[in-house]
UniProtKB/Swiss-Prot annotation:
Disordered, as annotated region: 1-55, 111-157, 172-209
Signal peptide positions on this chain: none
Residues forming coiled coils: 70-114, 152-177
InterPro entries: CCDC89-like
Taxonomic placement: Eukaryota, Metazoa, Chordata, Craniata, Vertebrata
Listed Basic and acidic residues bias regions: 125-149, 174-188
Tissue: Widely expressed at low level. Expressed at higher level in testis, weakly expressed in muscle, colon, lung and spleen. Not detected in 3 non small cell lung carcinoma (NSCLC) cell lines with homozygous deletion of the 9p region, while it is down-regulated in 3 other tumor cell lines.
Name listed for the protein in its UniProt record: Tumor suppressor candidate gene 1 protein
Modification Phosphoserine, positions: 150
Keywords carried by this UniProt record: Coiled coil, Phosphoprotein
Amino acid sequence: MWRMRGGATRRGSCCGGDGAADGRGPGRSGRARGGGSPSGGGGGVGWRGRADGARQQLEERFADLAASHLEAIRARDEWDRQNARLRQENARLRLENRRLKRENRSLFRQALRLPGEGGNGTPAEARRVPEEASTNRRARDSGREDEPGSPRALRARLEKLEAMYRRALLQLHLEQRGPRPSGDKEEQPLQEPDSGLRSRDSEPSGPWL
């Protein structure tokens, strides 16, 4: 009895499943057939046709990006060339600067060691100028010794004035002491300054101021 019920149950479920499948089948097939043309027209364009405009835009953008990339590459290459050229120029200028410094040092040392045989003769001239100045100064000093305002003339005049001052003091002292009968002793002191004055006057002296 249980076997009969189980068989009937299996048969009923199978029949019901077939009916449901039959009920669902036409609807799906209808939707599948009608989905191709949702607008109702039979000659519509598919998704591949609708993507043509976007593809063209992508191609244009890709071309622009490629051109920009090439321009950037050219600018970088130009910058690299300029940088290399500037580096070479900098290295050349450094070498030139070092060479000039060495030449300057060598010339300076040569001028210090051999002042008379220098390249331009500047050290020899620099040493010759003070010597000429000292020689001229000595010549001027020797020539001015005989002038009225020279130290030699002033010294001679000072000595002459000192001798006259001593004579005046001696004469004043004798006058204060009074006259004496023996004039030999008085004349002897008076002659001493005269002899000194004459010896000093014999030297060349300048005129009076």
